[in-house]
């Protein structure tokens, strides 16, 4: 459930800042909160985690996390069970296949607005994760983002040295590319045969890689790692996902 899943995210943060058994605490909070509703559980656990991080002496970190989490209930208001799904962005980035995130966004979001929102949020969470960790998951943090040690203890410093560079750099337009890719994917792989579906998936992947390359050239961004290989993997996953969806729709109902 959404409350239980989100409990794992703040618990890792809590464990990094306190000596208390944060996973146990977060899990207990999530279990109680999710009994009320997934949306209430997600909000309560998230607010508790942010308050805990701030009280532990890292208000700047709490602010950056809040900026990552705040758009989720707004853009996915009708689908609280997807509120933790943007974590797929940084997770796939850690595996070196971040550009596959729109495939999962398209698969999880039933309708076009939800698919677009999930695609955009997946990149936003990845960008915030790069700023927090200092690791390159796709493009890396903008040059204006300094090490977390320089801003984690100050709200103004976090805004100036983390959030402002994140939002003023052209790489944030990647969120729009992912949103569009996730929204269009199911429509492009609806061909009458596997061959047409494969053509649609390949065209979709080529267009996405080309759009990201165009952004890189326009804003002088770092080159994405192995774009052709990751694009091919994304096309394959898109094709598999399309066929799984078709089979699920054709499955007869058994009483």
Question: Locations of the language-model features?
Answer:
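Generic multipass alpha-helical transmembrane bundles of integral membrane proteins
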Residues: 91-235
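A cytosolic-side transmembrane-helix exit/cap motif
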Residues: 44-48, 65-69, 82-88, 106-109, ...
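Short, aromatic-rich membrane-interface segments at the entry and exit
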Residues: 17-26, 39-43, 58-65, 81-85, ...
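Core alpha-helical transmembrane segments of integral membrane proteins
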Residues: 1-57, 66-74
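Cytoplasmic membrane-interface segments at the C-terminal ends of transmembrane helices
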Residues: 30-40, 73-82, 106-114, 182-199, ...
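Membrane-interface helix-loop-helix junctions at boundaries between adjacent transmembrane segments
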Residues: 31-32, 47-117
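Alpha-helical transmembrane segments in multi-pass membrane proteins
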Residues: 3-8, 25-34, 93, 105, ...
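Juxtamembrane/interfacial segments around transmembrane helices
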Residues: 37-38, 49-57, 76, 118-126, ...
């Amino acid at each position: 459930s959404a409350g239980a899943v989100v409990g794992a995210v703040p618990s890792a943060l809590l464990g990094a800042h306190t000596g208390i058994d944060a996973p146990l605490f977060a899990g207990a909070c999530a279990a109680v909160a999710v009994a009320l509703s997934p949306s209430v559980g997600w909000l309560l656990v998230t607010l508790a985690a942010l308050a805990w991080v701030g009280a532990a002496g890292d208000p700047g970190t709490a602010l950056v996390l809040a900026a990552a989490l705040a758009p989720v209930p707004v853009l996915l208001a009708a689908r609280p069970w997807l509120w933790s799904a943007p974590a797929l962005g940084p997770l796939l980035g850690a595996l070196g296949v971040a550009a596959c995130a729109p495939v999962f966004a398209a698969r999880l979001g039933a309708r076009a607005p939800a698919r677009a929102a999930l695609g955009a949020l997946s990149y936003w969470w990845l960008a915030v994760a790069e700023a927090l960790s200092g690791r390159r998951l796709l493009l890396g943090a903008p040059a204006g983002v300094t090490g977390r040690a320089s801003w984690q203890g100050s709200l103004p410093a976090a805004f100036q040295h983390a959030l402002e560079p994140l939002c003023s750099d052209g790489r944030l337009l990647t969120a729009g590319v992912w949103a569009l890719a996730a929204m269009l994917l199911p429509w492009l792989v609806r061909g009458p045969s596997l061959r047409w579906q494969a053509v649609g998936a390949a065209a979709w992947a080529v267009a996405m890689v080309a759009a990201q390359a165009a952004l890189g050239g326009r804003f002088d961004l770092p080159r994405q790692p192995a774009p052709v290989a990751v694009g091919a993997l994304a096309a394959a996953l898109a094709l598999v996902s399309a066929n799984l969806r078709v089979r699920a729709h054709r499955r007869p109902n058994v009483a």
